Amino acid sequence: AALPELHVFGRVTPEDKLRIARLMQARGDVVAMTGDAVNDAAALKQADIGVAMGSGSEVTKQAAKMILTDDRFGTLVTAIKLGRSIYDKIVSYVRYQMSSLFSLVLLFLVASIFGINDGVPLTPLMVLFLSFFITVFPVIVIMSDPAPSDIMTQPPRDPAVTLANPRSVLQWLLYGVVLFAVILAALLLAPDEPSTTVATAATSMAFVVAGLGSIIGGLAMRRDPLSGFAAPIVGALGWLSIPVVLTVVSVEVGFMQDLFMTQGLTGPQWMLCLALSAVLPVVIEGDKAIRRRSAR
């Protein structure tokens, strides 16, 4: 009964270690146990994360999931911080990629069902450009984002909750549907009809919104539930300026227009594209703000 209030155990035996690990696991805790002697192997095997000392016995090392090569307990804190940061980045990366994938799948599915531009809302080269040249930079931003200052005060994640849990899938779908909707809106609100043979403002605007929406959306999705627009942000903006320039060049420069079958846009058309591109990050930040408030 006193286990939650106890923080230090003295003169414990290997049997005590095993019992403590089982009791804490029964409470739903994630347990890490350290040891160096042969008789510590049972407790290390029982724990969720068995940590053997680098100077410990070979039997203990075999039973452990991790070996503390420098025998310094402070290294465990560094390892936990790094592990949490890596996991958060993986979650953010999957969220970003799945949202982008859902948006394109929905776009082509709806275009095929309703006969929008013969089922080809974006040219194949546009899709390849978005997938391999535009989205790579938001991914770099996600992977290079520093760990939040409070990462070590957060409770351990539930190991039973997978990456593709129902809540995450709904989040991917929500963000993907929003991005799909604004791309489709750009296609339908353009002053002309899309075409599969000549450059039009419709396909050009849809291409711009798909690119800018993915870029700004990636900035917002780099952290969760913290705001993606909070500092530090200068490095992220530097990386994201590259795909922004590439998107503008693809629409406004002559030889790129011939390559991607795009045409230059007017000022009002650019303003509409920017407004539509801002919808996804607004939805993302609103979703995160609601979850932060409900968690208080």
Where do the model's predicted regions map?
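Membrane-interface capping segments at transmembrane-helix boundaries
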Residues: R223, G286-R296
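Structural signal for the N-terminal portions of transmembrane helices
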Residues: P124-L128, T200-T203, L259-S277
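Hydrophobic alpha-helical transmembrane segments in multi-pass integral membrane proteins
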Residues: V182-A186, V244-D258
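Alpha-helical transmembrane segments
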Residues: S214-G218, L280-A289
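Membrane-interface helix termini and inter-helical loops of multi-pass transporters
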Residues: P191-T197, F255-Q263
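Cytoplasmic-side transmembrane-helix entry/capping segments in multi-pass membrane proteins
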Residues: F229-G238
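Membrane-embedded transport module
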Residues: A1-A32, A47, G54-L226
